[in-house]
Amino acid sequence: MSISSDEAKEKQLVEKAELRLAIADSPQKFETNLQTFLPPLLLKLASPHASVRTAVFSALKNLISRINTLPQVQLPVRALIVQAKEPNLAAQQDSTNVRLYSLLLASKGIDRLSLQDRQQLLPLVVSNISCLTGTVAARMFHILLKLILEWVAPQESSHEQEEFVQFLQLDNDGFSFLMRQFTRFFLLVPSKQVQVSQQPLSRGYTCPGLSLTDVAFFTYDAGVTFNKEQLNKFKKAIFQFVCRGMAATQTIEQSPRMIELMEFLCVVSTDSTNLSDDAAQFMKRFPMPYENEEFITFLQTLYIGNTANGRPPVKAILQEKILSILNRSHFATTKAECISLICSIGLHSSEYKLRSLTLSFIRHVAKLNYKNLNPASSSPSSTDFSTCIVSLIRNNLHAEGWPKLQLGPQTPAFNTAILQRQLQYETLGDILKRDFELVSDLSYIEFLFESLKNDLPQFRSSIQESLLSLVGHLSILPQQSKLKLKNLLRKNLSIDEQQREDNNDAVNSIMALKFVSIKFTNAAFPFHDPEARLFNIWGTVRTNRFDIIEESFKGLQPFWFRVNNASINTSATVKTSDLLGSHLSETEFPPFREFLQVLIDQLDSEAASITRKSLNNAVRFSKQCLISNAIYGKKTMVIQDEDWSVRIDKALELDDTVVSRVNEMVQGMNDDIFIRYLTLLSNEFTATNSKGEQIAIFPYQDPIFGSVLLTLLNFVSNNVLRRLEILVPDLYHLVIMKFQSLSDNDLAVCATIIGIISTAIADSTHVKRITKIAQSQTMAETYVASYVVPRLYLKDQTNHIESDSILNLLNILTTHLSHPGTNKDMILKLVCQVTKFGLLLQVSAQERKDFLKKVMDTIQDKLINDVTAIQTWSYLSLYSTDLENSSLFQEKLLETNVSKQNDFLFSVGESLSVVAGKWSSKYLIKQIDIPNFNVEIMQQKFPATNVTTILDEIFSGCDSTKPSLRKASCIWLLSYIQYLGHLPEVSSKCNDIHLRFMRFLADRDEFIQDSAARGLSLVYEIGGSDLKESMVKGLLKSFTESTAGSASTSATGISGSVSEETELFEPGVLNTGDGSISTYKDILNLASEVGDPALVYKFMSLAKSSALWSSRKGIAFGLGAIMSKSSLEELLLKDQQTAKKLIPKLYRYRFDPFQAVSRSMTDIWNTLIPESSLTISLYFNDILDELLCGMANKEWRVREASTSALLQLIQSQPQEKFSEKMLKIWTMAFRTMDDIKDSVREVGTKFTTVLAKILARSIDVEKGVNPTKSKEILDNILPFLWGPHGLNSDAEEVRNFALTTLIDLVKHSPGAIKPFTPKLIYDFITLFSSIEPQVINYLALNAANYNIDANVIDTQRKNGVTNSPLFQTIEKLINNSDDCMMEEIINVVIKASRKSVGLPSKVASSLVIIILVKRYSIEMKPYSGKLLKVCLTMFEDRNESVNIAFAISMGYLFKVSALDKCIKYSEKLITKYFEPTSTENNKKVVGTAIDSILNYAKSEFDNVASVFMPLIFIACNDEDKDLETLYNKIWTEASSSGAGTVKLYLPEILNVLCVNIKSNDFSIRKTCAKSVIQLCGGINDSIPYPQIVKLFDISREALSGRSWDGKEHIVAALVSLTEKFSQTVADNNDLQESINHVMYTEVSRKSMKYVKKILPLYARYINVNPQEETITFLIEKAKEMIRLLGSESDDSEGSIKQTSDESTIKRIKPNTEITQKSSKENIENEEYVINLLKVSVDICNNSKSRYPMNLLEFIIDEIAYLFHNDRIIHTWRTQLAASEIGISIVGRFSTISSADFIQNVGRLWDQTFPINCNKETIENVKLQMIKFGGLIIQKIPSLQNNIEENLRLLNSIDSTSRIELELKNIGL
């Protein structure tokens, strides 16, 4: 078959290309040809002709083989990648093979590229990578992975990093594609299949989180596979590339790129490699986008997988991470389908942590978006999902063991199991709480109750909370469920925990069960449900826990029942008044009969135990039911408020309406249940019957049974009383048998009950036996008879009683009364019984008179403080007409005024009402306890006689000046109108009574004041309409007129009885903190234009703190107030002027600092103002003006009250109402903060805090406030806050608060505050110094005086600035500012740094500069010069900490400075260091600045390194150790290699040295000299000759001129140079001569101190090049110096000797040599000489020509001198040195023949041995001498005998093991 010309042509081209590649005979040619022919060759793979393609494949096979054998050959990678992306083909050609093979070869070529070349390819590879598809995209991605595998990340936050991001040029699509694939790559796990090289790649596996397609992309499509190690390498590279490369500059929150980065980091943070920790840390840099839809959806998709594309869920550890994020996201709760799958996966997981997080997620969803847990909102596939969740949780609990957790092998760790089970219970509660349907059938409630009862104690609180969360559902349960719930609660509450006392956990579980049951009872059933209330009563059993009892009583008290139910009503909006119970409504009680029926039924049931134990409370509640049923819907004193219990207890005593209503109700009761109930009460009261058998079922004693029985018997019908006849024997038996043991109260109750029943059965045998009274009967029998007979008389039932019996009774009583051994109080109470009911009328007048006389004689002297005697006396007065002196009764009672007991005085008041009104007294009428008795019968028998007389006597007492009489009269007057007020004789004198009470209001005694206030209330009630009107007007007048002190005797004048000078309080009684209020004038001054609150509000309102309530008797008067029944509000509505004056003042006084005043005022306000909020709104402006005025009042109470009131006012009203007066309000608020009174300041602080919050809300543009309005508010307020009333105020509290307010505004309203940023930054910076505590400033200034380092204090001050909230605020201001503000901000920072005075403000300025550089690096560049100049200027500040702060700022500024600026200020720093006036501090600051530049602007430092490095090198040798350390640190960090760096910058170093080594500052000269020495160690001979010469020239020139302290360092430098460059010196005669001359000159100087220092250096110099002249000169100078040493001390000692007497000399002489020997000076001199001699020995040893024998002789002579002179006293140092010098001299030669040398050595030995050969010489010296001797023996035989003999002598004198060993070593 013929081939076409195109095909042939193409094939020819392929063959040519293949030939050209094949004939390349070297790798270089092969590489060149590849660059040219390989890409075109690959294009032919797209040929339509198969033969051409086959030819290409064949060529490629050969090519690849050859390429593999030539690893050095580079492939045209860039061209291949470009071709793979856009092959140069016709549109119809298939480019697949071209692309794939281009990428295959490109991938091979990448392995051969350098790191730099690889990096250059990155932009090409990533550009448009998102547009590639399929295999091409996979291979390109793999190429990218290979490129970044060894990529070196730039430094964090550096310019290089920013440049790299721009270099990549990655568009948004590319970024998204790469981030998506990088994220997926971290989910990849290696295939478990072992890959063999010939085997094709597998594409058949998935990973958690990756589908088949996803895995294939990384493996099959890319043509690669990974093992674990390779995978980890690539992951590490990807992480570096993403976090420090392509995504490094992402800072915009919620941007798409940021979201993709966070998705990536989430996945990486759970990776199995150690990258997880790095990712977790990196994530912390950014806010988690919890509410970003894309991010949350991505996580949810990862968690649940995708069935559509076959992607499974991710691993459990990543699921846990995802759930921990979803648990904080609101958006995550919005997708029902996702929630369904998430919960299902989590709850079915075997991983404990995942299950726990799932439970938390369910709770999270339930809390925020419960409907999405609801089946209705889920997809059809997840029907009944909510039910599934709770069922699943319940099943899990069952599986773990239920009702008690069972621990088994499958159970996780105990703590883990406990926590998870707790969470399951809590989750269950959360779901049930929000789903009524689940609760309505009670199955879950039963389940939880059973769990609570039986599960482990650790779960108790969780189960209990879950149950309690359901109470909101209970009230709406269907009726059937409620019945079921009742049975459940009955079962729970009737459990007897005492049967399980041995098991404490079980008891606690039962208690928890009961507590929840009581809560359920109160929530589920209405108050009128008798069974529910019985459950409450069961809860009050005394063996229950306190909280159960408390909760049970709340269910029995209607007020708390309402409050409780209001608070649990979650389904509806509840009024605050309902929550507080302040809106009083009437709650219906269970019907009395129904409750009795339920109670009796329970007592008859098998489970009666619990009812019996709580019987006392059941009876108490039954009484409350009875009263409440009777008065339901009626106005009485029984208001259902928090004091309802007290009210209902006292109601039958004090409220006639209650009595009549109860009477009506009880009269109609006579059924069997009622009789059974009364019998029960009697049985419980008597406990045993007449046969002695136990009939009580309540296990304890309680007086309630007798009390309730007696109460009921007061109202029952005669028919009922007759049915109760059977009770009499048991009651009578109780009195007779237990007379001595029963309490007085029980005896009275029992006898009264018998008396009442007897009235209905007068003809019964029981009554006849009781009334048959004989003289000889017992006291018990008399006791009962005294109660029965008078009541029979009242009912006119005495016809069955023998006349003698009554007389016998009276005689028995008088007999007992006169008998000394009887209980007089009891007998008197019996006398009361027989007298008060008129029984004495049954006997003759004479017998009556005799009886009265006997009793009166017995008690009239005992009337003071004996209440029973007083009562008896009043009852005797009923028969006063039978006596001659009837006035005696009132006289004796009036005499009791001396008593100080309030209750007793009230008793006297009651008695006076009886004496005056007889049976017209309400007090006596209330004593009748017989049902249906007509009191008028008794009133006719005992008419009122002397009401007016006694009232006049009381008036007289009221007008008395005697305090005790006044108090008694006040109380008696109160009693009088209470009990006799209904009589015309009393009501006609209302004006007089009113006047007396008004006067009592001003009394000092609070009890009198309260009594008077209550008296006024009673007068108001009984007075006529005229009196009421005048009283109300007088009261209003007292409120609103300041002339309240004007004297008036009118009854209408509120202050008529009080003058301005009337003393109300003893000094000190009413202490205000600023002195005591003592006169009425003081009181009037407390308020502006308002009468005195202490007299009006406090006493006109009977608050519960009233003194009356503290008295047992007085409490009867503590009802209501004068305002309570008035219609003042109508009057206020009619009289607007009065209202405008009264309401603002009334409002203010509600907040009076005195609690009594404020409480009373609140009572009056609540009474006058029914609609409080409406009234406040109506009179808002008047109230506001009053309060602002009051805040400036001179009285602290007014100021404090006004401030508290205004605080309340502005919180309750919209801001628009007071916005116009905001500045005035702020001014007054700040004024109160600076008040002289601490309590006013405290309230002022609270007020300003609230103002600040209101201000923040009103300007918050982020919350929708109009920006224009916000700016308008701030334009007014901000100048105020930073003006003289705010930040610049004299008061510290005000300053601090203004500052706090501004900080809060910046924090919470950044948008609104933005335009004011520059001004605020300036103010805040300058404020730092003002707010610093003065004590710190003082301490810093006077640190030296307290021995404290000022720098330490300054460091703390600096730290205080950095950590200050104020500085954080500045930072926030800068972060929120715009580029356009930059110039203004920089100008204010410069201004602040120049104008600030204190350290904190200056430091703050420097820190602000740093923040600006960090935040606005690009925008800062134009201003860097100005700021650098400021920094340099601040180096001149006197405070080192300030200098350092600006030095650090300079480092940051270099980062944004142009090169010319950097060079300019670098040179200025160098100049500053070398200034002649430069101090250590200046040098330290320069060093800190350089260090800062190095750390924060590395690239800029490198640009000016040639300026800095010479200085750093030189400064490393500074004299100051701290500076030396600082600069050495900088040098180490800045130089890559020490010696190399020195060589690099040597010319610059030499230039700096040349300029500064001759500085006028000698310390700089020293530093330079030491630097030359250091240079010698850091360089070698290889440096250029001119530089060596320059070094010598620098040193020589520096030595010119006089000697100075430290000049020796330059000599040392010159010597070091000579040693280092000895050959150069030797080759240059001129140089050598010049050095010789300089050295000779320096050694010849006259300053011996200087010459002493340089002489050893001169010896070192000679050692380099010994010459005869220089050696001779050295010997001469050295000998001269050694002779001078010690001369000064000798002279001084000589002078001492001359002036001391002989005795002193003799005393100190033995110690003189020892003292001198060990002196520091002697040791220094000795060591100096030894050092000089040793250097001289080195000269001898280094002499290359003739041996300098003269120098040797000098050395030996000087050793001898050291041993024998008296100026330098030798020590072991010289002894040791002599031997060491000998060893050095002799040891140099192998053989010695010179006679002179041998002679000198012998002389040295002879000098050394005698000194060292004694017992005192230390061992080391002797050992060294033996070594010296051994060397002589070895090298000088002629001296051997002498030496050996000496050494043997040494051994004999002092032989030690070490000496013997050393001798043995040398052959001895």
Swiss-Prot record:
The modification N-acetylserine is found at S2. Belongs to the ECM29 family. HEAT repeats lie at residues 32-69, 116-153, 256-292, 313-351, 384-422, 439-476, 590-627, 707-745, 748-780, 781-818, 846-885, 945-982, 988-1025, 1030-1067, 1137-1174, 1178-1215, 1272-1311, 1361-1398, 1422-1459, 1503-1540, 1544-1581, 1649-1687, 1746-1785, 1830-1867. Stabilizes the proteasome holoenzyme, probably by tethering the 20S proteolytic core particle and the 19S regulatory particle. The proteasome is a multicatalytic proteinase complex which is characterized by its ability to cleave peptides with Arg, Phe, Tyr, Leu, and Glu adjacent to the leaving group at neutral or slightly basic pH. The proteasome has an ATP-dependent proteolytic activity. The modification Phosphoserine is found at S1692. GO terms for cellular component: cytoplasm; nucleus; proteasome complex. It comes from Saccharomyces cerevisiae (strain ATCC 204508 / S288c) (Baker's yeast). It is found in: Cytoplasm; Nucleus. This is Proteasome component ECM29.
